[in-house]
């Protein structure tokens, strides 16, 4: 689409929601895109998303046990997203630390001053990560584990991308991240690793048309393109490394790249309750 210019405005998820809400009476935004499905439930509940169901073929109904698209048709999944931990191999070696495998590992006192996370009040993906822990372990046990993990933090970043930046640079050794932060850092050549812990979930990253979008036709074309084979393949770019929702795209993925359509263990432990998460947003 060489004649269509796309302007992207990057905001924290919470700030993006607030912006759409505050400008709804004179809306100038066509699309909202985020990794956290609960954010779309907030906008849908406010009547700020327009229905659109793409006719692009090849996209299954589910990724893991979670619907790829909103059953009511207000937003569309274009990538899958899991949550876990990334680490800097050089940092861990220099500090004689093991790579973590489960959330509880990050509560070990050996990691004191060596870990980081972004603020869940400012990052939609971090909110979802904490919510996953609460839903997977139960509210009381989950918060207990999260508090013990937080006791080891060297820093809490204001933006979610501050965590991979800190791990990649060696400012701290281990960070709690959405999967594509770790996978894209690996793809870009940083000396890092990434793991999905057992208690994690798998949900779609979504995109939706805003109510009264000034360029509604082109907004729908953009969603369609994201779902085409060409659009899905872009997700495999080393600087992006998101999980496509078209299973056929994985034939072009690098070796050892996660494939949720073949590895049923990714996100199997937690069936994410988006309404519960929305209520605690």
Where are these regions (language model features)?
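Ligand-binding "clamshell"
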Residues: 43-51, 70-72, 184-196
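Ligand-binding pocket segment of bilobal, Venus flytrap-like solute-binding proteins
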Residues: 132-196
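C-terminal capping/gating helix-and-loop segments adjacent to ligand/active sites or protein-protein/ligand interfaces
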Residues: 238-244, 248, 253-281
């Amino acid at each position: 689409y060489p004649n269509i210019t796309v302007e992207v405005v990057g905001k924290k998820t919470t700030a993006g929601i607030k912006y759409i809400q505050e400008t709804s009476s004179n809306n100038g935004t066509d699309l909202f895109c985020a990794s956290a499905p609960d954010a779309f439930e907030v906008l849908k509940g406010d009547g700020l998303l327009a229905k659109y169901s793409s006719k692009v073929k090849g996209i299954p109904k589910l990724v893991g046990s979670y619907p790829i698209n909103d059953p009511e048709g207000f937003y569309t999944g274009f990538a899958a997203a899991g949550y876990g931990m990334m680490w800097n191999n050089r940092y861990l070696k220099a500090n004689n630390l093991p790579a973590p495998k489960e959330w509880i590992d990050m509560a070990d006192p050996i990691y004191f001053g060596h870990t980081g996370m972004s603020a869940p009040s400012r990052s939609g993906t971090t909110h979802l990560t904490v919510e996953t822990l609460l839903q997977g372990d139960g509210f009381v046990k989950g918060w207990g584990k999260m508090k013990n993990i937080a006791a080891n933090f060297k820093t809490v970043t204001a933006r979610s991308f501050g965590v991979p930046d800190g791990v990649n640079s060696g400012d701290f050794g281990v960070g709690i991240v959405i999967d594509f932060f770790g996978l894209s850092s690996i793809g870009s050549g940083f000396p890092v690793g990434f793991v999905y812990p057992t208690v994690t979930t798998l949900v779609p990253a979504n995109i939706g048309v805003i109510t009264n979008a000034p360029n509604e036709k082109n907004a729908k074309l953009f969603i369609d393109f994201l779902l085409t084979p060409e659009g899905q393949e872009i997700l495999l770019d080393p600087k992006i490394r998101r999980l496509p929702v078209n299973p056929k795209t994985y034939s072009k993925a690098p070796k050892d790249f996660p494939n949720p359509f073949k590895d049923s263990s990714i996100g199997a432990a937690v069936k994410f309750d988006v309404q519960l998460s929305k209520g605690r947003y």
